Amino acid sequence: LVPAFLHLLIYVGFLVINLEVLEFVLDGILGTHRLFAPLLGGLYTVAINVFEFLAVAVLVSCVAFLVRRNVMKVERFTKPELKGWAALDANLILVIEIILMFAILTMNATDQILAGRGDAHYLVLGPLFFSSLLQPLFEGLSSGTLVAVERFAWWFHIAGILAFAVYVTYSKHLHIFLAFPNTWYSNLKPKGEMP
């Protein structure tokens, strides 16, 4: 039951966080920053907090899965068919997901420090709970360094998603992409039904 719930958190997290990724991509194409903020007003801060909550949920779920696979040694993961490439593949995907979630939180933390310093490019959004916990790590940095960290986190997340999208097609997680078309095109008629 616990693994199913953790998988659900990861799945829902990635579906919903893709709305924020859409904004990342549009900001990159249009040369804007936080494109949806003026459109959503106060709801934007709520949305970003929801995205951050889901990012932390994904992060915690991935850490739990790493612990199950590598520390607890759950019996089904010790079988020969799940050793070698299968184990490495699963661990790579979990680590990549953790890093991508940290990139979102780092971007938001540095973004809000810059906004608080009055940088014209950055919008003060209101309190962002989870990224505010990371802000003390970055507050001593100069504004130029913060911009570099924020931009690196943004680019890393975009490049990471694109690389992940390619990698997944070669991994055991291809079902993530195929689930929707497989469900959409599935035959709903009972097997063996007479025409």
Label every model-predicted segment.
Residues L1-P195:
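Membrane-embedded alpha-helical bundles of multi-pass integral membrane proteins
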